[in-house]
Amino acid sequence: LSTYDLLTKRIDLLSERVSKLMIANATANRKIAHLVEFAGFSLTAISDFSKYFKALQANIENYVIAIAVKDTPGLCFTDALYADMQRIGVTINLTKKHWYGYAAIIDGGNLLAENSAYQKVVTVKATTEDGIAVVATSKPLKVGNATAISFNGVGGSVCRRGINIMVYDKTKKCVCDSVCFDTHVKGIDCHR
């Protein structure tokens, strides 16, 4: 190989490294921005749906998140709300899924279990890498109208209409929040 060929090859390798570093830097900058935005905030202080999921995303590696729908995901659930939920790993869009049961378990941003079904009880179960047994059950209006979420057998779902969420903090080894967002009303009421 000529010197030109060697230098061209080296430039290509360095360009590839720079591209990877730029992606890593953008990820780090996004993470820092989230941490700065939510520094000093506890999840329990947040009552806005979108901000809540941004806060979850900012510290996702430390959380085990269980979600269960009571009654219905609601007529006011939108693609924008789905985009918020995608931040933490949710893959099922609940837009126009009136009367669907839905449950999910996410560990550190990794989706462990997720399911939904029309007018059926939905239960998902998973054990996290840290050995935490998580169960989330969703019952739409006509098949029980309830939710049940538990971490190692200890429950605490708000159990109100809409998206019920319990968050387990792996660093503190306890549930740090239990909340419900009523996505059946335009204001997306928050209940604890």
Could you describe each region identified by the protein language model?
Residues 1-2, 192:
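Accessible peptide chain termini
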Residues 11, 23, 34-192:
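Short acidic-hydrophobic catalytic motif
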